[in-house]
Amino acid sequence: MPHPSDEIKLLIESNSADVLRLRRRIRETFALRDKSPSKLQEWRRACEIFHSRYDELAFPGGYHGALDRLVAGDPYTMEAAICFLEIRPYFFRSGYMFDAMLRKAKRAPLNPEQRARLQIVVDEFKAWKAAKQLKKVSEGSV
């Protein structure tokens, strides 16, 4: 039987792919924007579309206000935040979102299952940071 969060995770992954696609379109049109007025317009339109859709794609229910909703205990936002942290999507500004969401999730009124899932994320993140630091030390860059 699928977990209730599976649908949210699929949405996050799909939205992440859309953000990457829209961002790629900006880069493609940027390279040609000085070639003609129509190319400039294509680039402007790509930017406009990206910025108009980013908030809704970045996080289920919209990223604007999501951290406040998380700490306030909104059930959907709490589940979506845990899902986001578990899959750690990669797109424009997602790393900053991950850090902010992780900090806020620690203070959110999560249920016991969500709290356990968050602890796994925290433990994996600490291990990743330790491995990253160890690599820096072994390369002599610290």
Task: Describe the predicted segments one by one.
Residues 1-142:
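Extended repeat-based scaffolds of very large eukaryotic assembly and lipid-transport proteins
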